[in-house]
Amino acid sequence: MAFNRTLAEGINHMPLGRQHYRIWITAAAGFLFEGLDLTIAGGILIALIKAFHLNNTYAGVIGSTALAGYVVGVAIAGWLGDKFGRKFVISYTLLVFTLLTLLSALSWNGIIFGILRFLVGIGVGGESAIVTPYLAEIIPARVRGRLLGLSDAMFTVGAIIASVVNLVVIPAGPWGWRLALVIAGLPAAYVWVIRRNLPESPQWLANHHQLEEAEAVIRQLAPINETSDLDPPIGHPVSSASFKTTEHPSNNLYTLLWSTPYARITAALWIVWFFIELVYYGFLVWLPELLVKHGFTVVKSLEYAFLMNIAALLGGIGASFVQDSRLGRKSSIIFFFFLSGIASYLFSISHTDSGILAAGATLSFLLNGLFSMLYTFTPEQYASWNRSTGQGFASGVGHIGGVIGPLLIGVVLSAIGMAGIFGLFAVFLLVPIVAVLFLRETRAQPVERT
């Protein structure tokens, strides 16, 4: 038969090979460093309050500065990724993160630390905008949900490592928080070096009429000895006619996000991301301090945060497989949001140590499972010409919620307490269910179906 599959279909039918795993590990490492950074930032908040004599409101501002930078980072990186290529952006985002994280360890007051954390957030935001669109265009459809979901689970691996760092390093002395930031920044430098050898997305290359380069990437992904079940193997000569390119009408942001049929998709995704990140980052940044205010020692609060991160890792891994099951993306996401609302309510009414740990671990499991699915589901809603912009702005709007979450806790904690905060979060977690109903199911669909 003639080889007339589109490029995306060729990738979807490709066997999963060594190159896929190499690319996945190198790209997904960005999520690990994001989790490492944000969890260390939450852990050192207690030390910063003492070192810089911060009140709750100012501590909330400090906790939100990286998230504010994240909003800027996703907006810039998403647009750059669609215009200049995924590799262009992914090659530099970790460099920004590494340098600024190391510099933040030298901060001498809260203002300097906040400014540097804002700049760190720009690098972290760039990672979030580009990694999953990049992987979505390279990973075969039948395992895309699992590998993209597991990419986000790397965030929790980083958070678990950070919890150990927080537990061991921060209490060691007044310099502990500085050393924790150095530990967060140094490993990222190595990943940045090897990441420069990643290939460009073949779909992006084809859409920008670089067909020979796209074919070369396909050959790299699927060498002849791994493609014997394709008809014909991708190792055979491929003409430019084999590639289906998607003309993008404009680089105008309004067209990228709000043209038909993307207006409905964009609005729904922004609602979903805003509310989940408001809850998640409020929970993540303030959890150790909230537990201390509940009566736990600093060490005990960090131990509980570590156990909740273990639960979060299991949630991310589990959700990665659930979304590739017959249940599909939409039903899985709705189910997890509903259960998250219940878990948050249970956390709000828990008074015993075991009750707080059980409800908190369940909430961590479900929230991280949701992120694993949303980082798969969101780029699948867009086409290659607006995919990283769509992912970036959805995540960016979400991080506006992520900025509000820690600030909200800092402002109202003394008035309504931990119980009131998590009761409110329970309501916030039910709102996205309605928005998800307006999105299409994408399980096992070619990434370029639109």
Predicted regions, residues:
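Transmembrane-helix signature of 12-pass secondary carriers
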Residues: M1-T450
